[in-house]
């Protein structure tokens, strides 16, 4: 018996391309696809009345900060540094409070905390949907319903002539037990 040696297929890649670049389809660049908005017909400029007061007020602000006492500037910088430290503490405290409430059963756990609660792991499985009763009544099967029309003969057969009243023919064709009308 001859021995067959199987080797995996090797694809040659150019030196400057990786396998990811080769396997991904080329997508159009979003910058190339977006057209530049049309230039406005007239350039928009601010009214000279509004521009002049802003230009006058802007140089005054740096002069006012330079006139402050260096101790006041240092205190202002410390206050700015302290505020970001307080902000992270609030969400941590809120998360801890929520966790305490969830473990005490006062609040519904959410997210990752919901999966870690004992109720989620120890709760019995809900009954299957097929076992639950429904309010809708069952519809009777089509074959069970009595019909007033005579049964159609099979293809190629002639219809049988029935003697008697039409009500009797319906009772004979019915699958239900006929009711004796004389007993009533």
Curated annotation (Swiss-Prot):
Residues 1-184 are annotated as: Disordered. It comes from the Eukaryota. Residues 72-92 have a biased composition (Acidic residues). Residues 96-119, 159-168 have a biased composition (Basic and acidic residues). Residues 25-36, 53-65, 120-156 have a biased composition (Low complexity). To H.brasiliensis latex allergen Hev b 5. This is Fruit protein pKIWI501. It comes from Actinidia deliciosa (Kiwi). The lineage of its organism: Eukaryota, Viridiplantae, Streptophyta, Embryophyta, Tracheophyta.
């Amino acid at each position: 018996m001859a021995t067959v040696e199987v080797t995996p297929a090797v694809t040659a890649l150019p030196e400057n391309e990786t396998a990811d670049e080769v396997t991904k389809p080329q997508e159009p660049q979003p910058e190339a696809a977006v057209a530049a908005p049309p230039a406005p017909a007239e350039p928009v400029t601010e009214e000279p009345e509004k521009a002049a007061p802003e230009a006058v007020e802007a140089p005054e602000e740096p002069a006012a900060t330079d006139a402050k006492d260096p101790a006041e500037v240092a205190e202002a910088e410390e206050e700015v540094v302290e505020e970001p430290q307080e902000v992270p503490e609030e969400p941590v405290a809120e998360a801890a409070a929520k966790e305490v409430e969830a473990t005490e059963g006062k609040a519904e756990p959410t997210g990752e905390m919901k999966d870690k609660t004992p109720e989620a792991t120890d709760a019995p499985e809900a009954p299957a949907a097929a076992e639950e009763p429904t309010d809708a009544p069952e519809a009777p099967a089509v074959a069970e319903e009595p019909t007033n029309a005579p049964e159609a003969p099979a293809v190629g057969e002639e219809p049988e002539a029935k003697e008697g009243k039409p009500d009797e023919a319906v009772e004979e064709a019915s699958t239900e037990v006929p009711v004796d009308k004389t007993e009533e």
